[in-house]
Amino acid sequence: MNLFDFFRGRQKQTSASVAKERLQIIVAHERGQRSEPDYLPALQKELLEVIRKYVNIGNDDVHIELENQGSCSILELNITLPDR
């Protein structure tokens, strides 16, 4: 580093590093706005398979909702059972 670079401050970033930094910000922002975790669809599928062992239900008959209240997460499972 020469004396002029020291007084100019940081060197210019390359366009690749700027693009990478912007992409990281976008990904972090998208993750923060996501309301459901990654495992929720798989959990719904597995629960549906277990319930189908005992009751004949369709995919639309099971609704899973995850709600955050402070430091607690509440998993709500609603199953519409067929009439006997």
UniProtKB/Swiss-Prot annotation:
One of the Pfam families matching this protein, by short name: MinE
Gene Ontology biological process terms, A to Z: cell division; regulation of division septum assembly
Keywords: Cell cycle, Cell division
InterPro entries: MinE (IPR005527), MinE_sf (IPR036707)
Stretches assigned to coiled coil: none
Chain's role: Prevents the cell division inhibition by proteins MinC and MinD at internal division sites while permitting inhibition at polar sites. This ensures cell division at the proper site by restricting the formation of a division septum at the midpoint of the long axis of the cell.
Family: Belongs to the MinE family.
UniProt protein name: Cell division topological specificity factor
Protein source organism: Pseudomonas putida (strain ATCC 47054 / DSM 6125 / CFBP 8728 / NCIMB 11950 / KT2440)
Gene this protein is translated from: minE
